[in-house]
Structures are given as C-alpha cells and as structure tokens.
C-alpha cells in the first residue's frame, strides 16, 4: 500500500527526504532507517502498514509530523499515517493502530451506548472507570494527554477512546488522539502520554526529552518490587494467608482476581529487595466474552497468535482476533468488521449484527389427492407446531404457529388461553417444534427441532369466547432460539399505512399450512384466497372488526389442527430493498377452530396482524436487540 500522491509535490518530497537523511543517516538517501537498524524504502513509511520488522515506520514519533500533508481524499490515521480515502469504517484495518475502525468512530448508536455504559461502570454519570477501579471525570481527565489512570497502560489515552476525536485548531493532537495545548508541543517535555508532542521530525531534534516522573509511594519502595494497580497480584504466604506488603523476605504465591491472568511464575522468593525469578509476576486484564459474541445472527471464529482458539471461553487475552460471518438465514451487504482484544482488557468494537433473511422457501411441491399439497418442510419453513402437556403422559398437539424470529412464534390466543380462569396457561406446559412433518408428537424426522416456551404474551383485549375471539393473537418467546436452516426460516411481516390497516383486501392469493386428517397427519399447505371484513360479514354477521376471512380453493379444507397457523402470500419486494427476490409475508392468523376431526368447508376466519403492529414489532425488536 503506497501513497505515490506525495510524489506530485516535489518540494514536500525533497524536504521529507532531507529530514530523514539528517536524522536517520545510516541508510542511503532513498531509505528510512528502522529503530532496529533495518532499512526500508522511504515510500513504505507512514502508509498504514508496518514494513519495519519492529514497526517503527508506523509510530506517532515517526509519522505525526506528516499530518499537515495528508489531505482529502486520503484518510489520516490518528498517529499521522496517510492511507486510502475509503479506509474509515470499511471493516478492514488500514491504519497500523486500528484508528480507522474503532467502535466510537464506526459503531452504531447501540454500540456507542453499550461502550459508554461499560466505560462508566459503577461510576457516576460523566465519569469513567479506570482498569484499577478508580473513577475520573470525563471532561477533565479523558483524552487530555496524561495517563490519569496511572496504571501504566495509558487506558484513558488509548486510540480506542480518543482516536476518533477532533481537537480544536489551537491545540495539538497526540498520537493516540488526546488533545493538549498547542504551546506544549516541542517544549522539551513529554506532555502527550506517547511522547508524540516531542517527536524528532516534528521538533527537528534528536535529543531525548525529559519525561515527568511519577513518584512511587514509600510503601512500594520498600521490599521486593510489585506492579501497581490492577496488575498487582494477590499475594499469599504460608497457610493461604493474604499478604499486603511490603514484602521483604520469604516465599510468596501469586494469583489474580477473576478476569485477570497471571504472567510469570506462580511463586517466588523475596530477599534483599529482589525476587528469585527473573520477571516480576503481574496480572493481565483479559477481555470478557459475556454478551460479546452471543447472538443468533452471527457465528464467531477466534484466533490468538495465528492459532484458532475456542470462542466460548469466558475470557480472552489481548491480541485475540474475532472474525464473524452471518448465520444461516441472515445476511449483510458488507463484510462484518473484526473485533480485537486490546491491552487493558477491552474490545476495540462491538459485534455487528446481520439482517434476517425472511420469507424464503425452496424445493418443488406435489399435489395431494384431497386438494391440499403434501409438501417438503422447505415449502413452509416458518410453520411450527405447538404442543401442550396437561396432566398427561406426553405432549399432544394443540395448534400451529409461524416463526417471526428464531425465538419468537405468533399463534392464536385461544391456543394458549384457559377459558375457565380467563388467563393464559402456564408457559412451561408448552413446547414448540419446527420442521415438523408428522403431526403426532412421537413421530419424528431428523430435521425437526424442539424448544420450550419461556414467555406467553396475549393481545391485551382478548377475552375468549365472551368477545367472540376479538384480538385472538398471542406471541410465544422461546427459551432458546432455533438455529435456522433450509427447513427452519422466519416469515416476513410488513405493516401498512394507518388508512390501510382496517382490512385485508379481496382476492389475495395465498396459502396456509397444517397437517392433514388422513393417515399419518402429514404436513400440507392449502391454497386460499382472501376476502375483506365487509365481504365476510355477508356470511358471518358477528365477525369482529380485527378479522378477515379466506376461502379455501378446490377440495382443500381448513381443519381443527390448523388454528394458529398463518395465511401467507408471496409478494414482490420494494425495488429499493436489500432483498432482490419475492418474499412470503404473513397476513393473518387462523382464528376459528372447528371441533376435532371437523373441517371448515367454506370460509376460515383470520385475525388480521395489521391491528397488532406495536405488539408484534416490539416483541421482534426485543428479540433482535437482546438475542441476535
């Protein structure tokens, strides 16, 4: 990755070469000398890619002086490198410090809110929590150039927290993004945590500058040295007795609190202010995976030092990289950005979700002799069976339903409602089965998957038979999401404008799924056509306002076991949609329920989902926000 545009400015190019030749004279005039003595081409310096073996060509000390020369259309990394203009938030780390892909630069509103909550921890509003646990005021101590957390990690001056910031024109931007007074640059003292305000190329000097010294407390000057802050291990002596310090003599065992891992020996002997081991043990903060990788819309692949590691571990060391791909049944228009565990034990960005790919089906169908179509599960992959256990030996079939998200089912309220108590049945008496080909609970196929129910939500106005099944609609949240496949997919929903909500129009060609009443009760779908509420009233004068009806076509029937199932229709998608094919959409839920082994020969009453937009969308949004 070379930025040959600098060649278009010969005066800049000659001046830059002269500076490099003056300060790094060991290499020839067309080369840059790395800190380890290696020589690389001048054109490979400050281009976002580490070309020196030690990476010294991509540091703030080397690159911060080039900032004024990096203008649009190029993108300027926080430490000063100049890279391709599309680098910002394209999912690829073009900058050596990752400043083009930080969470605060690229994250959505949810990512930023989550980041702010974690940064605040249990501190007050407008404060942030250091790794050591102390709370500091954001406006005074965050990204001010100083290591105010004083733990040696520069946490409050990190690129992740400060790299996205814009500094005022009168100030100087440090190599990690913090802002200091412009008068402090090149004053002979390091006022930026990374020393970038005294960079040799910026200040035209080669002498070492002084760094303010943090005076250690007298306690730490006595006895064997120990790390400060959260890096300090838990010290125990004989009999697991916790030691405080100073440690002047004796054998000490080291351990760390949860979330930290010990680097160094587990025990050492202290004498004459020195440990018997060559390195001082310290605790390193690892990145927690709690809530980071979880989500049914993506799958994660974790690596550390180039080796694949188990993502399910509760903590990962700094340097761990996580790649994501969309789960089956989900998609994205651009590659998902990677996550990295940073020094200090935090992730550089949040996980990005994929979009649900609903309403898709596959495989041909064959005609069923009675007028319905016996089908492969892929033809109605959103259709599920609802089974109940009421003081019996096993579950028995109750109703059908439709999958809205991997963990949310829509069905009829009367399927889960106790007319005697006027309350829903207990959620733990139900079980949902997806990809169910045979209706009987005990007749299974390898494709079917089972989930328990953890929450039942019934439409607030539902009163059962007393109100003639008005608002006959319920949502079931599952204890665990289904893993989507070619036989398990959610149905699409869309909601019309206010004026169009009152009724489904006439003659919408669609179908509903159920299990036939013959032989093994195999899965089938029934073709049908819709009729508006006003047309339905000619046959059913007491039909409620939230209903429409469908007429089954041919000899096909709607039977008792079809209650709760969905009437769906294939529709073309919007030309501006990210979908490029027709999709199947849910129009209504079967409400009327003939007696067992009876079927409706004429019309079937449906609950129109358009009357429940808030209820449905709120539940779907909860699923996406908490579990996708």
UniProtKB/Swiss-Prot annotation:
Disruption phenotype: No visible phenotype. Viable but highly susceptible to septic injury with Gram-positive bacteria and fungi. Adults infected with Gram-positive bacteria E.faecalis and L.monocytogenes rapidly succumb to infection, and display reduced expression of the antimicrobial peptide gene Drs in response to septic injury with the Gram-positive bacteria M.luteus and E.faecalis and also after injection with their purified peptidoglycans. It comes from Drosophila melanogaster. PANTHER family: ACROSIN-RELATED, HYALIN. GO terms for cellular component: extracellular space. One of its GO terms (molecular function) is serine-type endopeptidase activity. May be proteolytically cleaved via an autocatalytic mechanism. This is Modular serine protease. It is found in: Secreted. Its EC number is 3.4.21.-. Disulfide bonds join 27-39, 34-52, 46-63, 70-82, 77-95, 89-106, 123-135, 130-149, 143-162, 167-179, 174-192, 186-203, 224-270, 256-283, 302-341, 326-354, 399-415. Residues 26-64, 69-107, 122-163, 166-204 form the LDL-receptor class A domain. Keywords: Autocatalytic cleavage, Disulfide bond, Glycoprotein, Hydrolase, Immunity, Innate immunity, Protease, Repeat, Secreted, Serine protease, Signal, Sushi, Zymogen.
């Amino acid at each position: 990755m070379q930025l040959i545009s600098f060649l278009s400015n010969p005066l800049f190019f000659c001046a830059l070469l002269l500076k490099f030749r003056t300060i790094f004279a060991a290499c020839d005039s067309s080369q840059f000398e790395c800190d380890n003595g290696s020589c690389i081409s001048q054109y490979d310096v400050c281009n976002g890619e580490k070309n020196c073996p030690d990476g010294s060509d991509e540091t703030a000390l080397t690159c911060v002086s080039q900032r004024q020369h990096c203008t649009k259309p190029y993108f300027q990394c926080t430490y000063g490198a100049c890279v391709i203009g599309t680098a910002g938030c394209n999912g690829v780390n073009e900058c050596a410090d990752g400043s083009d892909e930080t969470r605060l630069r690229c994250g959505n509103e949810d990512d930023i809110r989550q980041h702010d909550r974690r940064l605040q921890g249990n501190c007050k509003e407008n404060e942030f929590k250091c790794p050591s646990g102390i709370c500091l005021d954001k406006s005074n101590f965050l990204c001010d150039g100083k290591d105010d957390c004083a733990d040696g990690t520069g946490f409050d001056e990190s690129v992740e927290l400060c790299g996205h910031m814009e500094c005022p024109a009168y100030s100087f931007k440090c190599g990690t993004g913090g802002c200091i007074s412009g008068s402090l640059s090149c004053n002979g003292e390091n006022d930026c945590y990374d020393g970038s305000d005294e960079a040799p190329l910026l200040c035209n000097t080669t002498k070492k500058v002084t760094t303010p010294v943090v005076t250690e407390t007298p306690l730490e000057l006595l006895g064997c040295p120990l790390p400060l802050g959260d890096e300090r291990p838990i010290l125990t002596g004989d009999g697991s007795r916790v030691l405080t310090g100073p440690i002047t003599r004796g054998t000490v065992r080291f351990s760390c609190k949860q979330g930290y891992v010990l680097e160094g020996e587990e025990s050492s002997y202290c004498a004459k202010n020195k440990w018997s081991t060559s390195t001082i043990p310290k605790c390193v903060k690892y990145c927690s995976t709690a809530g980071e990788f979880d989500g049914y819309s993506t799958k994660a692949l974790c690596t550390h030092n180039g080796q694949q590691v188990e993502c399910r571990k509760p903590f990962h060391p700094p340097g761990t990289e996580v790649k994501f791909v969309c789960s089956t049944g989900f998609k994205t228009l651009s590659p998902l950005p990677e996550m990295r565990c940073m020094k200090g034990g935090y992730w550089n960005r949040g996980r990005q979700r994929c979009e649900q790919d609903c309403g898709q089906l596959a495989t041909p169908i064959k005609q069923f002799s009675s007028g319905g179509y016996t089908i492969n599960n892929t033809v109605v992959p959103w259709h599920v069976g609802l089974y109940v256990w009421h003081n019996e030996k096993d579950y028995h079939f109750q109703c059908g339903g439709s999958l809205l998200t991997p963990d949310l089912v829509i069905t009829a309220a009367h399927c889960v409602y106790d007319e005697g108590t006027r309350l829903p049945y207990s959620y733990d008496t139900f079980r949902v089965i997806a990809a169910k080909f045979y209706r009987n609970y005990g007749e299974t196929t390898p494709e079917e998957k089972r989930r328990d129910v953890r929450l039942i939500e019934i439409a607030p106005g539902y009163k059962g038979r007393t109100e003639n099944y008005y608002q006959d609609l319920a949502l079931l949240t599952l204890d665990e999401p289904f893993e989507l496949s070619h036989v398990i997919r959610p149905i699409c929903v869309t909601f019309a404008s206010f004026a169009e909500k009152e009724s489904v129009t006439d003659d919408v060609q669609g179908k509903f799924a159920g299990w036939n009443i013959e032989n093994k009760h195999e899965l089938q779908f029934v073709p049908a056509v819709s009729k508006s509420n006003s047309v339905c009233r000619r046959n059913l004068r007491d039909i409620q306002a939230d209903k429409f009806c469908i007429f089954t076509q041919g000899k096909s029937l709607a039977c008792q076991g079809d209650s709760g199932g969905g009437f769906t229709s294939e529709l073309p998608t919007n030309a501006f949609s990210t979908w490029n094919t027709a999709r199947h959409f849910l129009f209504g839920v079967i409400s009327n329920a003939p007696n067992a082994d009876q079927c409706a020969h004429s019309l079937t009453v449906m609950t129109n989902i358009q009357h429940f937009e808030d209820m449905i969308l709120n539940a779907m949004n909860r699923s996406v926000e908490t579990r996708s």
